[in-house]
Structure formats: C-alpha cells, structure tokens
C-alpha cells in the first residue's frame, strides 16, 4: 500500500497542504531512523534498515517530483504556492540573500554527496565483501565447536543463521547505499531544473519581470532543495553509522562513553594540554 501511494504521488498533483504533511513526515521519519541506529547494540538488531532506507529514498524522490510540479505550475502566484514548509525553509536559509541560500544548499549537497554518502557506500561495499569472504570459515568454526561439545546443536544452528543474516544485511546495505547516492545526484539536477525552468516559465508564460521570477522561484527552489537534502543527509549519516557499528553489548552512546572516557590518563593529558 505504501509503495502504491508513493507511485501515486509521482502521477497525481498534490495540493500544498498535503505536501506540508508529507515533508514533515519525511523529516520525522529520518530523525526516527537516526535515533534507532543510535540505540542498536548490533547492526542485525535493525535488520530491516536497508528496506526502510529504500522506501524512504523512494518517498523523497516522489516528493521531489510532486514539489517540482507545484513549484513550476504555481510558483508565479507567490512564495507560498508550494506550501508553508518549503516557504519557511527558503525564507529561513535565504534571509533576504539568494546567493547565501544557494551557497548553503551547495555546501549541504557536497557534504552529503561527496563526504557522507561516498564514504558510507565504500564502507558498505568493503563490509559486504569481507562478510562474504568470512562466510566459509564461520560455519566450519561452529561445526568444530559442535563436535567438541562446546555448543549445543541449537546454538550451532543459531550461529549459522546469524552468519547468513549478517551476509544478507551487508549485501543489502551495499545496494541500498547506491540508492542514497543516486538520490543526492537527483537533488542537484532537480535544483537546476526548478531554477532554470521556473525563470523561463515566469518570464515567458506569466509575463513576470526577471527580478520577480528570480525572487519567487529562487526561494521555492532553494526551500524545496533544503527540505529534501536535510532528510537525505540524516539518512546518509544513519547509513554511515550502522555500517561502521561494531557488535557490542551496549548501544552506541554507551560504547563511546566506555571506550573514549574509560581511560582517565588520556583525559588528564588532554586537560593539561
């Protein structure tokens, strides 16, 4: 049902208030995913993360298409034509200076695409490869423990299932990270389409001056881009966190506090410096 709704968003024009609700839901979903990643002790505890990541990426792309349609069709009516969320993001970031808004959006895109997404994709690829390479040895070690009587048959079966689930998880993460990187690329192209197309439509079809068209469409375009890039950056961060997460007994906060602040000598030296 959710997938069909996402596909319908691409085809059916959405009113601005529906876009506001969906953009708010998208941001909230990204925050929930990041928080869930923080509180898992092992990556397999969030085994549905690749599926959630894929659905969230598809939702964001569908919202990009829907908002682009609204911006290009109704942008000449004013900065509130695409909803309050896009207008608020645009006004907050631009602050009366459109160059600043464009620069902020470009910086966020570079951070997301060139740093977080690229690094997370590389880590996912290496993790999947290392997990697959280690698969033959782990069942053999479990079989040796079973024959030696160190584990029961149920425990050996559970270990084999965990090895298989771990390989499937990191393999899925390797593929899902490609969707995230493609989404970041699509965000750049959508920004250019909205800006160039908006200026052309405003000046040629609605007899707006170049300054008025730039004011309306620049604000809507930058607001639309930021509303999409913020959840994308959060999900990219979640991908990077979960693929770099080592299995432990505590969540990420507990492990960081124990390992980073568990050595008083290092803290005293840092305080002295």
Regions found by a protein language model. Give the residues of each.
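Hydrophobic membrane-spanning alpha-helices of multi-pass integral membrane proteins
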Residues: 2, 6, 258-273
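Central hydrophobic cores of alpha-helical transmembrane segments in multi-pass inner-membrane proteins
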Residues: 4-6, 25-39
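Residue-level signature of catalytic and energy-coupling elements of molecular machines
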Residues: 22, 60, 123, 176, ...
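Select transmembrane alpha-helical segments in multipass membrane proteins
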Residues: 99-105, 152-154, 270
